[in-house]
Amino acid sequence: MPQPLKQSLDQSKWLREAEKHLRELENLVDSNLEEEKLKPQLSMGEDVQSPGKGEPLHPNVRAPLSHVVRAATIDLPRLGNKLPAKHHLGKLSGLYQMKGCTFNPEWKVPDISDTHFDLQVLNECPSRNWKYLTPAKFWPKSISYFPVQAGVKAKYPDNVMQHESIVGKYLTRLYEAGILYKRISKHLVTFKGQPYKWEHQYLVKQHQIPDGATTRKINGRAENRRRGDPAKSISRPHDPKRGCNMVRQISNNRSSIRPCANNGGDKHSPTTRRLACWGGKASRINQSYSSRDSSAPVDARGRSESAGSLSSLSGRKAAGNHHHSTLINPSVETTARGRSTPGEQISARDTSALPESRASRACNKDSSIKEENVWYLRGNTSWPNRITGKLFLVDKNSRNTTEARLVVDFSQFSKGKNAMRFPRYWSPNLSTLRRILPVGMPRISLDLSQAFYHLPLNPASSSRLAVSDGQRVYYFRKAPMGVGLSPFLLHLFTTALGSEIARRFNVWTFTYMDDFLLCHPNARHLNSISHAVCTFLQELGIRINFDKTTPSPVTEIRFLGYQIDQKFMKIEEDRWKELRTVIKKIKVGAWYDWKCIQRFVGHLNFVLPFTKGNLEMLKPMYAAITNKVNFSFSSAYRTLLYKLTMGVCKLAIKPKSSVPLPRVATDATPTHGAISHITGGSAVFAFSKVRDIHIQELLMVCLAKLMIKPRCILTDSTFVCHKRYQTLPWHFAMLAKQLLSPMQLYFVPSKYNPADGPSRHKPPDWTALTYTPLSKAIYIPHRLCGT
């Protein structure tokens, strides 16, 4: 082929070949442009292509990719209807056809330690992020509440009781680790561990009163908010006829005190009995008992306390009546910080109505429940006796089926009428990661243990995140994993730590969620730095998962699912093999359900940057997913997908960005197109028909790429420069994307475009040239720009 750089190129064989390529490109456009401009060329009928005779298991991939792409534009895949179709594609299945979870009655609750980071971190790691984290706040616009009995999802219908029992143990473990509040009453919760400074103002302090009764001093005030009189205890002498000692307590609540032994929605039926009360009148009291509540610290409305030897009664005059109605609270209150409060004791005459275990404990005057390191908190909110999220258990992972993982479903805050718009945060894509990673440095990765449980919540926000095991209600004191706000908070948390680590230890640091990546040119220095970093974080109360931490500097590391060595990034070979196996099992002409296709596209998207393909090649499957219809693979389309997985490539870290000087320019009018070279050569072509100007411009740029193969091209079409061709026919868009992806396109105003003259039958003008790239610069955080 003669070089297209001379004045006489319009008379050469090159021009005739260019005309041939132009007609082929125009045929690709015209085959579907008139009918559907916005949809790919896919038949929606019943003419399902049958598999060819002797269809090979391994598709023929010896042909170049460009030939395979053109074959796929002729033998098109098909969209179908919404009738039932195949739900399995190799080892993949539709999202609603996933293998159900298997219940394991021997599940163990994993060890969960108290993750309480020291607020000294605000001084050690100065950052504006801490104002969003100490404490974090969660304010949904609207909330849907569910009954306590629905706290555990019916994931395992044959093992409901066992499932709830293990969930209860899991929540108890979280409570003991200081991650959950436990509901005592509408205004009172309890928690374990060390309180944060913003919780101190809501802590409830208990003081012993000489006569044996107990009152509570809240924020330094021991007075009744409603009546204004000081809290006091009035005891009546023992009456042998009644067999009970009545103790009157002042209530700080606006409403009468109700029994809270059933706090959290006990599933047992309430026991009704009559007791003799003040004034010789009988009042009917409904009390609920359960084996769980008998040993748990309970407070009625957070104000009435157990008092002395027998049941404490709160007596109030009822409006319009001449007798006193009394409500009985059988709750047992334990004290904070090891301080004991006399427990409730019930006379032998009344214990017959209680369960045997409860009666035996209640009759024991010497037994008092003591819990260490327990704090009572009356938050600046009410604590609802209902839940906002549901729970269930699954295996911890595919390799560890002996331990359980708690799944928290707060999906009401991310979809439906209560959906919230959570803040966006910077997350590196593959292109960014390639540009920020340093080349040729040893690396160490650190992993936070229980990362989300480092993030404390405001007590008022905790009341919006209520869960239950079916009996008791708990609230998340730390950020749960099932809320869309938690990843944003974790990003702020690790970013603040990473910035300080990079500054203090003079090491390149990158953080993503709970992963830290440290790089330094000297391996021995990096090894010592990693130990110092771990010590620094642990002194601040931040826990490191040493099982997932690199013990010493390495040259090849797995980070964010990629294999990263000193110069390149790649994907593990096992992942390629699995994907090729799935493609081999595609049956040409068979209908596949769109949910199954959705999973398949997810796997292809991850590996696509490491191939010579582009996203336009997957658009037919995206069309099936968008329209929720079945999909059928053609033989050529299956070959194309297999060809992509065979052309595996590694991506260079820190790719050299070159800005080549433009030597070729293109321009188009509705009827003519032109290509101009900086040496003065030019060629003018006549289109077969009039089309939209942006299509004519793209045709000329593709033709210039095919015939001249320049490193960059000048064009005055912003549509072409941005390389977003979704509105074009699928096969033409795929070919254009394939041709133009690896090269630079510069925008030049029409008045300065050298090819503007030849398209209007005038000589080209390269004297005054002004151009600019329109590609958006990749955002990189400032602290990572210097590497």
UniProtKB/Swiss-Prot annotation:
Q: Which Pfam families match?
A: DNA_pol_viral_C (PF00336), DNA_pol_viral_N (PF00242), RVT_1 (PF00078)
Q: Where is the composition biased (Low complexity)?
A: 305-318
Q: Where is this region: Spacer?
A: 201-365
The segment annotated Polymerase/reverse transcriptase domain (RT) runs over 366-654
| Coiled coil residues, start to end | none
**What controls how active this protein is?**
Activated by host HSP70 and HSP40 in vitro to be able to bind the epsilon loop of the pgRNA. Because deletion of the RNase H region renders the protein partly chaperone-independent, the chaperones may be needed indirectly to relieve occlusion of the RNA-binding site by this domain.
Domain of life the protein comes from: Viruses
- Tell me, what is one Gene Ontology molecular-function annotation carried by this entry? RNA-directed DNA polymerase activity
Q: Which InterPro entries match?
A: DNA/RNA_pol_sf (IPR043502), DNApol_viral_C (IPR001462), DNApol_viral_N (IPR000201), Hepadnavirus_pol/RT (IPR052055), Rev_trsase/Diguanyl_cyclase (IPR043128), RT_dom (IPR000477)
Residue numbers spanned by region Disordered: 28-60, 210-274, 286-365
- Domain Reverse transcriptase, by residue range, is 375-564
Give site residues, Priming of reverse-transcription by covalently linking the first nucleotide of the (-)DNA.
Answer: Y96
Compositionally biased residues, Polar residues: 326-350
Q: Which UniProt keywords apply?
A: DNA replication, DNA-binding, DNA-directed DNA polymerase, Endonuclease, Hydrolase, Magnesium, Metal-binding, Multifunctional enzyme, Nuclease, Nucleotidyltransferase, RNA-directed DNA polymerase, Transferase
Q: Which GO terms describe its biological process?
A: DNA replication
Q: What is its EC number?
A: 2.7.7.7, 2.7.7.49, 3.1.26.4
Region described as Terminal protein domain (TP): spans on this chain: 1-200
Q: Ranges of Basic and acidic residues compositional bias?
A: 220-242
Where on this chain does Mg(2+) bind? D447, D514, D515
Functional description taken from the UniProt entry = Multifunctional enzyme that converts the viral RNA genome into dsDNA in viral cytoplasmic capsids. This enzyme displays a DNA polymerase activity that can copy either DNA or RNA templates, and a ribonuclease H (RNase H) activity that cleaves the RNA strand of RNA-DNA heteroduplexes in a partially processive 3'- to 5'-endonucleasic mode. Neo-synthesized pregenomic RNA (pgRNA) are encapsidated together with the P protein, and reverse-transcribed inside the nucleocapsid.
Q: What is this protein called?
A: Protein P
Q: Which organism is it from?
A: Duck hepatitis B virus (strain China) (DHBV)
Q: What is the lineage of its organism?
A: Viruses, Riboviria, Pararnavirae, Artverviricota, Revtraviricetes
The gene for this chain is P
